[in-house]
Amino acid sequence: MINGIVIIHKEPDYTSHDVVAKMRGICGQKKVGHTGTLDPMATGVLPVCLGSATKVCDMLADREKEYVAELLLGVETDTQDITGKRLAERNPEVSAEMVREAILSFQGEYSQIPPMYSALKVNGKKLYELARAGKEVERRPRAVYIRELEILECSLPVVRFRVICSKGTYIRTLCADIGEKLGCGGTMQSLRRTAVGAFRLEDAYTLEELQQLKDGGRLREAILPVDSVFGSCPVLHVRREYLRLLDNGNAILPEQTAEKELYAPDRWVRMYGADESFCGIYAYEADRKRYRPVKMFLEKE
């Protein structure tokens, strides 16, 4: 079994589930998972986890994300992007400066209402299923955080911008909210995800490129190790005589590591065996003076 992470450059018209299905065929294994849905029309970075790395899917989904989007002003659709049914069209009587002020006003924390065409569940039903049935339900606003907003090009009625945002941010909804603030409406014309955490588009592979690597017996060249997700965490190595504790997912005492370091309570550390094999994420418990396992990644072929 292959254990690791591959950064997919998702192309248009593929769903995230389509990508997972393709990767199962390329890798020849069932244990494959994606780390956050991209709409079929969207392109860009989609980290896919293989084998033991599927345990980090939820962790990657929580990471900050970067997008480049195109906003079409003067158009409103039911899906908040150009794939949906047009609900209203008007001439956007706005200036470039008005657009700039409106867009940049969303930087920081703001309250966003999730779109009906989304995979969020209400009373056990996905919102998009209700929307397709012609039903609309009340959605609670959620706090999202926009760390950076940069206008890349303004050729009215189209505005291209870059955004770095927290998990759970809908760029379609951001586009609609900008249009509403300008009084002319707006919809998302295109979307490309350029980064998920430290994983960037320039390091991504298309499905075709991965198939070519597979055919040439070089697929593992594209696979990142599981611990690449935790690059900011300090490293500890368990001494050889205590490896059995590590293999069983037990707590580890500081003196049972080569470094004997004490880190701040609850600070995550990467725990390795004496042979440099990554085994898991641990956190220090100050009251018990030990490192407790947070999540284990014992790789078994």
Cite the ranges covered by each PLM segment:
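Catalytic cores of RNA-modifying enzymes
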Residues: 1-167, 173-205
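Accessory RNA 3′-end/elbow-binding domains used by RNA modification enzymes
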Residues: 1-11, 17-34, 38, 42-45, ...
